């Protein structure tokens, strides 16, 4: 009773064709296939990435020193001092 019988699948297919139209279905199937291919390739890359660090550990570079609150980074990448805020008295 809970399983889908061939008649149920036929009704579902007819409803899908009526809702989406015969012109949009090939485009939707093509997009779904492309998405699945991308997903499979990403899963393979993740598996390859997991296997690579176990065999050859890569040295991590030392983190760069971040500018402090009293300095700002200018266009050439050098840190320049920033003026300190002054107190303004109301009139």
From Swiss-Prot:
One of its GO terms (molecular function) is protein transmembrane transporter activity. Pfam families: TatA_B_E. GO terms for biological process: protein transport by the Tat complex. One of its GO terms (cellular component) is TAT protein transport complex. It comes from the Bacteria. The chain crosses the membrane at residues 1-21. Signal peptide: none annotated. It is found in: Cell membrane. Gene3D superfamilies: 1.20.5.3310. It is a single-pass membrane protein. Keywords: Cell membrane, Membrane, Protein transport, Translocation, Transmembrane, Transmembrane helix, Transport. HAMAP family: TatA_E (MF_00236). NCBIfam families: PRK00575.1, tatAE. Part of the twin-arginine translocation (Tat) system that transports large folded proteins containing a characteristic twin-arginine motif in their signal peptide across membranes. TatA could form the protein-conducting channel of the Tat system. Belongs to the TatA/E family. The Tat system comprises two distinct complexes: a TatABC complex, containing multiple copies of TatA, TatB and TatC subunits, and a separate TatA complex, containing only TatA subunits. Substrates initially bind to the TatABC complex, which probably triggers association of the separate TatA complex to form the active translocon. This is Sec-independent protein translocase protein TatA. It comes from Rhodococcus erythropolis (strain PR4 / NBRC 100887).
């Amino acid at each position: 009773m809970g399983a889908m019988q061939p008649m149920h699948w036929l009704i579902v297919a007819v409803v899908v064709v009526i809702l989406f139209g015969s012109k949009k279905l090939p485009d939707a199937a093509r997009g779904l296939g492309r998405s699945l291919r991308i997903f499979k390739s990403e899963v393979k890359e993740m598996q390859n990435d997991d296997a690579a660090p176990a065999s050859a550990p890569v040295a991590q570079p030392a983190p760069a020193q971040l500018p402090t609150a009293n300095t700002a980074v200018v266009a050439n990448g050098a840190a320049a001092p920033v003026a300190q805020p002054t107190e303004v008295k109301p009139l």
